[in-house]
Amino acid sequence: MRLTDITDTKQLSVKINLPYQTNIDKNTMANPTTKQELLTAIADGYAKLNEQIDKMSAEEIAAPFTFTADPKKCGVRWQNDRCLRDLLTHLYEWQVLMEIFVMNIREGHPKDYLPDEYRKNYHEMDRMLVEKHRNTTLEEAKELLAQSHQTMHDLAGSFSEEELFTKGYFKCTYTTTMAAYFLSVTASPYLQAVKLLKTHQKNTQVRDKRC
């Protein structure tokens, strides 16, 4: 089953913002300027996320997030995530939307990245994406993200250098690049997620000490 088979494809053709910032933390890796660098950034970001998850204890994985109560600490995009499963399925759903975005371009009817019902209310959109997976297990969430991550890597690799890095090459990307869209649903949020999980670890350890 393709990822696009399980997601509503209704879109609205108006200018939208990218889901996440696209600038990579320069202390971690440089912003990609070639296709190979983009693919490396996507792969490395995913590897770092999995490395961070592997470092977490069972107690830390089971503990609910506390940092999401303060948007200044986690950013509005992560406010509705209450646990690791939420974070992973959130990433997965953003990548599903990206696959739909690319498929629409290739099928000759390009549309904007976000569906109509999501574009006008990001917070409600993120809440809906999290609620959609209330019955998804953590292991299922990991598998879903593994599949969508591979899809993102393969799709990014299928574009030419010109298609990826020319601003406005596709009208539906407006004044930005296709590479920026791929970064905004892969490497950038992967690295943001790593930072959030490290914060969660510290918070959990502090709570344990207080107990």
At which residue positions do the language-model features occur?
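N-terminal amphipathic/hydrophobic targeting modules at extreme N-termini
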Residues: 3-8, 13
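Short, Lys/Arg-enriched N-terminal segments with co-localized hydrophobic residues
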Residues: 11-28
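A short small-residue
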Residues: 27-30, 72-74, 125-133
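Extreme N-terminal tail/first-helix region
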Residues: 27-54
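A non-catalytic, amphipathic alpha-helix used as a structural packing/dimerization or gating element
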Residues: 40-48, 143-151, 188
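Short secondary-structure junction/hinge motifs that connect adjacent elements
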Residues: 55-74
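Short, contiguous alpha-helical
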Residues: 68-124, 153, 163-211
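Acidic/histidine-rich alpha-helical segments that form the ligand environment
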Residues: 120-165
